[in-house]
Structures are given as structure tokens and as C-alpha cells.
Amino acid sequence: MSGRDNRGAGGGGGGHQPLSSAMGKLKEKLTRAGDDQGYHRVESNLSTSNTATSLDTILPEDPFLFPQAAPQRHPLPRPQQQQQQQQRQQLRLLEDEPPLSFRPLLEDDDINEPPTQPFQQQQQRTPLRASGSLELTPLPPPPTSQEIREHRDRQQRSVPVPVEDLQRSKQSLKGSRVSFEKNNASSKPPAQAESSDEDSFEDKRIGFQQQKATSVDHKGILKDLKHILANDNRRQFQAKKHVSLDVKGTRFLQDLLKESSSEEEFHKTRREFQGRKHQSLDPRVTFKLDKVLQGSSTDSDEEGDDPEHKRLIHRPKDITKPLIIDLKDLESESDEDFHTSRQHFQQQRSISTDSRKSRRPYEMDEMGNKRGENIRHAVPFVRQITEDGKPKLEVYRPTTNPIYIWTQVLAALSVSLGSLVVGFVSAYTSPALVSMTNRNMTSFEVTPQAASWVGGIMPLAGLAGGIAGGPFIEYLGRRNTILATAIPFIVSSLLIACAVNVAMVLAGRFLAGFCVGIASLSLPVYLGETVQPEVRGTLGLLPTAFGNIGILLCFVAGTYMDWSMLAFLGAALPVPFLILMFLIPETPRWFVSRGREEKARKALSWLRGKEADVEPELKGLMRSQADADRQATQNKMMELLKRNNLKPLSISLGLMFFQQLSGINAVIFYTVSIFKDAGSTIDGNLCTIIVGIVNFMATFIATLLIDRAGRKILLYVSNIAMIITLFVLGGFFYCKSHGQDVSQLGWLPLSCFVIYILGFSLGFGPIPWLMMGEILPSKIRGSAASVATAFNWSCTFVVTKTFQDMIDFMGAHGAFWLFGSICFIGLFFVILYVPETQGKTLEDIERKMMGRVRRMSSVANMKPLAFNM
């Protein structure tokens, strides 16, 4: 390109200003574009024949394009340096290609239009030298706006540029005539992105809306699929639902069968009904329920508009549209049939919808619907159901820490040693009276009347101790009350061992009986308030087992010791009991009742373990105590006489009465004497040992059966066993008293005694004590339990005191027949009045007994002391 062409374009003073203005705009635009693309700015002098203009040109950072005038660079980060090195290696492959050139713009050029020259024409230009001089080339005519739009459309429809061409195109200038041609035609320069071109903005918005619509369509398709799937599942459920509720279908079939006039018509009608029935299994089928009308059914009517003979099943046109069914369409002959069908359907639905609910976790009583019934009494009662389908007696949350369970075992073992002392003292008279009535073994005479008082004064003292035990455990505490009985037990045994007359023996027995009455009430209360529910069944057995062990120990030791040495052994037994009681704490519930929260927390920490969290249990005890305080009255004994409380109290007293009037304590106290009078060939002391072992083993058998067979079943078995054995014993003694030879039947008394003890220990031994804690209302449980315990000891005193007199008055056979008759009456009492409490919660039992529900205290869950006395 010659220099005069340029001079002609810019010659004269009038043409210099427009050219300078255009060059200034170009300079500003290229400066911004270069800064955005990461190019350095280099000053160059563009020389013409008569015009010298300073222009800031844009040079790329690659030194290969301009090796003579490489600009100074600042140090770049390592990732950018590595990228530049890769670019240099790629560009060295192009060393044989000629360098690119550019020219300045003329006045008549449109600087806003993109370059249209091909890349091959730019490569034919002369390279830019170090001096900055340029060789100018003529420009082609600028493209029109229509050509630019067509070019953009072709760019949008073009195939994406490869990565190598894209990286190479980044090295070229964008958006001006002083530019290097780029192969990536789809990318736009930043300077052009900043322009306010409405066409470019509209194109971008249209493209974005198309992408958005496409994504929305995909989401809509997924949503429709989910809706169709859910609707299909719902349709299947509706099919099952209305099949179970369709009481009209069977009636319709019956009507059709009744009106069939021939066997062929009968089979045809049955096939049609079966077809409709099996068609209901199709998940795509919904139900159309029509009211059943009272009319005749014929084939012509079924074709017509008679709703009775319309098909109950049809296929809807739109399978995604749900069918709304009104329950009023399910018309039945009576409301009772409708409610029964609905309840049955609800039960089946709860089972079919979730297989995990096939076993009901709870059951609910039906609400009363009597007219005028108070709504507060119509609230249904909910009970938890165990895995075997039976109601659960008590619901507890496991909180036991297995590492520290030994503390609760120690507490249960300590109080159980007190139960061992109680059992030993209770059975003392049976082996001791044999040697005590022997003049060669005592320094004083014991008459038969005095011997009856030795055996009967202890139950009388136990009655007084049972009455006094209630206030003692409330004011002194459970632990302190039990601990206070240890020293009197030792003193009472020493009085008997060192006795020089009958009065000292009676004093020792009275003191021992008073302690037995207190211990029989306080021992189960302590265990109920300290042992956790998870181990209460196992540890609650220890007092009963140790009581029977004490009875067995007394029988065994009595075969080798006289009455004095046996009393010394009884004085030594409370010593370990006394030592262990000092190691265990007071019950947390008693501390809470006295407002000693910190001591209650320490007691719980000792029982549950140092690492256990006792705050939830402590808060529960405080809430329970607050409820008990609100329900408490000043005169608790008057509460026993209320109408709602008399029924459970009378049942508890009746069980205690028939327990003692069965003659159990009389048999235990006079076992040796009975075998001696019977003339049995078996040693009397051996018989007592056998009876004690049977009593001990029967306790564990009853523990295994009481929650499986039920309370009333065991009471039936116990009554029948005692009735049979008592009447057989009475017959044996009747034959002996009338001079008949019974020497060949020496085994019969022992067999009857074993069966009698076994039957008693299975039912009437532990169940009256257990049901006392179950049926007595929580509000009066403390006072009512004291009355029941006192009544039990009163009956024990009467039986043991009058047993010898009954034998003298009516003979042994008369006494056993009397006890058997009382057991026979007790059998009818159990059948008619005693409720079954197996598998029922305390709330349910109280609601059945009293007609309302109260909050149960955890003290009520204690297992009473149930050893035989």
C-alpha cells in the first residue's frame, strides 16, 4: 500500500480533526478490550508522508508473534507460567508461517462492525517490526447490518469449535479492525458484549427461555409419571377397599339365585357374578356403587336403567382421574351392619397397608353409647399388646445399667436375709415343741394349753406389728424400720434360749412376732421402691425364696437340736442381716416424700450406678409424689368405707381369710405332732424336711406359671388340691380313731401333706399377696394393705391358737374336714368374685373395679412378701 493513498485520505486541515477523533475512540475501545483480554499496551509510532499519529496498539503476550519487541512482563503465578509454556510449545510448530500484520483505521471505516477479512488474507500482510512502522493495506467495503445478522445466525447453527482451535483463537484480538482473525466464530468479544444491541439480547433471552422450557418439560414428565404411579396404587387400594365393603354384591347374587327358574339360568348367573368378582382384581378397575333397590331382577331390566342390576365395575375412560365415592352409597339394611362392616374394613386396612402393623401394638375398649352417659366415663382405655397378642401388665422403659446391677442385687439380698429370719421364726414351734414338752429336756413344765399359746402368740403379735408397721415406714423410713427389727429378733431368740419358765418363752415369741409383722410389710415396700422394673421380677422372688429357705433350715436343724440350741441359732441369723442393712441406702421415694431431693439423688446414684443419668427418674418420683399429695385426705381410714373402695378391699380380705382358714400355718406349726399321732412309719423330722423342700420348690414353680396360666386358674388348682388332700387326711384319721388298722397306710399322710403344700404354694400362698397390690386402689393402697395384713395375722392367730383345741374337741378328722369345707366355699368365692388380673395394667384393673382410672404409683408395682407362715 502506497503512502499517497493515506495522505489523500487525510490531506488538508479539514480532514485531520475527524481522523483524530476516530482514532481517539478506537484507542479508548481497544484499551478496554486489551485490558479485558489480558494484553499489554505498547507505544508505536505510525509514520506517513505528512501525518504523524501516536497510537496505542494492542500486542498479544506471546513473544513468538513479535520477537523483536517483546514487552517487559511481571512475574506470573506458577499455573499461568505452565500454561504459557504449553502455549509456546504449540506455537513453535507454526514457525514456518509468516507473521500477522495489521493496519490503522481510516476515517470512513465503521469501528463498530466486526472484521470480515478471512484469516488467509491477514497472513499475507507484512509483519510488524520492532520500530513500530506499519505497511498499510487497502480495506474491503464494510459489511451491512443484514450481513452481520446472517453471520450471527450461521454462528449459532455452526458446529462447536474443537478445543485446539478455541485455545488458538484466544490469542487473537476481538472486536476491531486492528485484530487477528479467530476460528471460534461462536464466541463474542467482551467489547461487543457490553454493547446495547437489542438483537443480541433478544437472541440470548430466547435461547434461555428455550432451555428453561425444555427443563420444565422434563420435570413435568417426571411429575406426571409419579402422579400416574400414585394414582394406580390408590386405585388398587380402592378396589380392595370396596370389595371388602361391598355387602350388596352378595345380596344381589342371592336375589338372582332365588329368582332363577332353571339350572342353566342358575349356572349362567353364577358365571356372570364370578366374572365380575375376578374382574375386580384388575388394578385399572374402579367401582361404581349403586343403591340396591327392592325389585325383581330379569335380563331385560339389567339391560335397562334399573340401578339394582347395573354393573358395579366399569372401566373409566381417563385412568388418571380418580373416582370419588360417597359412603352414603354403601347402604345396608341397618346401621349396625354398616358400623360392623366399617370396623372390619378399618382393621383389614391397617393390616394390609403396612405389613409391620400386622401385629397390633395396642388395643382399645369400645366407648359407651348409652343415652345420658357422662362423656368423661366414656373415654376408651388403651392397653399395650405384647408379641403373643395378650395385653401387657406393665409398660416400662429399660434404664438398667448392667455394670452396676450388683448394687440392686446387694439391696435385695440384704432385705431377703431378713425374710430368712422371718421364715425361721415362723416355723420355730413345729420342731421346738417336741423337745419343749419333754420334761427330761426342760427345767419347766409346758402344758398343752401353754404349748398352744407358744404357737399362737406369735401371729397375735404379728397383727400388732402389721398395724404399727405402716406409721413406722412412713416416719422412720423403710430402711430404718427394717434395720430396727434386727436387734429385737436377736433379743427374742435369746429370751427363748435362756428361758427358765413359760413366761420368758411367751415374751420372746411375742417380741419375735411383733418384728415379723413389721418386716412382712416393710420388706416388699423397700424392694418395690429400689429395684428397677427390668429386674423386679427376678429380684422380687428373693424374699419369698429366702423365707421358705428359713422354714426348711428350721426343720432340718430341729432334727439335730433341742429347743434351746435352735433358739441360739435363731439369734445368730439376724447378725449378717444387720451388717448388710448398714451398707444399703434409704429408698429414694421416701427421701422425695420428705423433701430431701439431694439425698434422693445420691440414693439413686448408688442404686443405678455413678455413670447413670438419674435425673429423669428423680423427676418422675417428684411428679408422682405431687399427685399423691393432691389426692391425699386427712382421714385415710374413712376412705376405706367409701362404696368404690369396699369391693376391692373385700376381695383382698376374702383371699386372706381363705388363705389362713385353709389350715396352712396349723399344718406347718404342728407337722411333727401330726405325723406322730398318725402313727406313720416314716420319721416325723424327715417328714418335716420333705414338706419344707416341697414348699421351697413349689415357690419357683408358681413363679413360672403365675403369668402364663393366670391367677384364677392357679387358684382353682390350689383349691381343688387342698380340698382333696384335707378330706383324705380327715378320712385317714377317722379310720384310725375308730380302731381300724391303718399301719399299711403309713405313706398316705406324707403323700397328702406333699400334695397339700404343693397345691397351696401354687395358688393360695403367693396370689393373695400379689392381688392385694393389684386390685387395691392407689389412693388407699397403704392403709388398705395394712388392714389386709393385720387381718391375715388375725386369722393366723385364730387358726394356730385353736387348732389344738379343735383336735381335742372334734378330733383330727373333724379339724381337717372343717378346713376342707372352708376351702370348698373358697372355691366358689374365687369363681364368683375374684377378677382375673393376668396381662392387665393396674389402670385397667382399677377402672374395672371402681369405674374410673387414677394414676398408679410405682409403689403399687412392688411384689409382696409371699412366703408361707
UniProtKB/Swiss-Prot annotation:
Superkingdom to which the source organism belongs: Eukaryota
Keywords: Cell membrane, Glycoprotein, Membrane, Phosphoprotein, Sugar transport, Transmembrane, Transmembrane helix, Transport
One BP annotation, GO: trehalose transport
MF (Gene Ontology): sugar transmembrane transporter activity; trehalose transmembrane transporter activity
Cytoplasmic side: 1-404, 474-485, 531-536, 586-654, 707-712, 774-779, 835-869
Biased composition (Low complexity): 44-57, 79-92, 118-127
Primary localization class, coarse: membrane
Organism for this UniProt entry: Drosophila persimilis (Fruit fly)
The protein's name in its UniProt record: Facilitated trehalose transporter Tret1
Topological type in the membrane: Multi-pass membrane protein
Homology family: Belongs to the major facilitator superfamily. Sugar transporter (TC 2.A.1.1) family. Trehalose transporter subfamily.
Entry's transmembrane regions: 405-425, 453-473, 486-506, 510-530, 537-557, 565-585, 655-675, 686-706, 713-733, 753-773, 780-800, 814-834
Stretches with biased composition (Basic and acidic residues): 25-43, 147-156, 258-291, 354-368
One GO cellular component term noted in the UniProt record for this chain: plasma membrane
Stated role: Low-capacity facilitative transporter for trehalose. Does not transport maltose, sucrose or lactose. Mediates the bidirectional transfer of trehalose. Responsible for the transport of trehalose synthesized in the fat body and the incorporation of trehalose into other tissues that require a carbon source, thereby regulating trehalose levels in the hemolymph.
